[in-house]
Amino acid sequence: MAGKDRKTIEKNYPGAEVDEGGRFKPLPPADDDAKLLVCEYPSLGVIRLDYDYPPALGDIDHPGSFYYDVFYRVVPGLTFGMCQKGEMPDEIKQRFIDAIKWLDAQGVAGITSDCGFFMNFQDLARTVTDKPVFMSSLCQLPAVVCAYAAHEHIALFTANGESLKPMRDLIKKECGVDPEESRFIIVGCQDVPGFEAVANGDRVDVDSVMPHIVRLAKETVAKYADTAKPIRAILFECTELPPYSDAVRAATRLPVFDAITSCNSFLAALMDNPRFGVNNWHLSWDGSQTDYRYGDNLSADLKAKLVNAEHAENVAAAERKLAKDRQKPKPATGTGTAFDA
């Protein structure tokens, strides 16, 4: 519960004891037969690239995408290029390790990242913590593969169709799956109108991009619908694709796995199931996210090492422009929806 003041905690959780750091102390057993202590609700830890951008709702960097609390930690100096190559200078590697340790100290139940290329550091991260580490939505791939017949296709959507090729050996090593097997259909979104904003680090106009992503998904599924190898599932590799997951599910009637479902599945394994068994062994989340802005929870020295801090004003300007554009009246375009694309 780090980041919440004592009064808020005492109001929402009467009787709970809180230490000086604002964290819950385990409550004593209700009686002599009680074996379980009440603990905090599970929360998620997210390692961030040193890259400030305006995340859309559904993006892993938007705390509103989750039904549990999220703690973010940016790694100063860790750029997208380093992440893509899977190489960090020793100084930045230590900052990455320190970031994992910091999230661990917040009591998170699992740790992920805001870029699929963090799969390059999956092995390093899991040696630093005993919490489950799922740096990419591709961590779900073994379960998805297991769920469907060998002759059925699985579509893998990425920001760029070429991006998975250099990661082939890594994915085989970490996931036990070869992305170049014939059962996988690799679909790049680099030509989707408006989605180039992802590569530019700008705010994506989700409403404008939505019908194009849906159309791409429907066309991809339709291409194999009447064959002996239909597409049975879709996995979004890019962390900025989940905002479109629900629309694609509705349009294709197929399961869509993404970075959010990856986080949900791991955290659900540490959540109370109220339907049966022992109940109320962890406290309920009050629905308020821990406040976070880019660079928060870093020391002054580390903040000075951020390479993308100057991007913040550009982000703010883009947000203001988007808000202004949305206020302009739009010409009538018919009654179609994203699902009709």
Swiss-Prot record:
Residues 1-10, 319-328 have a biased composition (Basic and acidic residues). Its EC number is 4.4.1.3. Keywords: Lyase. It catalyses: S,S-dimethyl-beta-propiothetin = acrylate + dimethyl sulfide + H(+). GO terms for molecular function: dimethylpropiothetin dethiomethylase activity. Mediates cleavage of dimethylsulfoniopropionate (DMSP) into dimethyl sulfide (DMS) and acrylate. DMS is the principal form by which sulfur is transported from oceans to the atmosphere and is a key component of the ocean sulfur cycle. This is Dimethylsulfoniopropionate lyase 7. It comes from Emiliania huxleyi (strain CCMP1516). The gene is ALMA7.
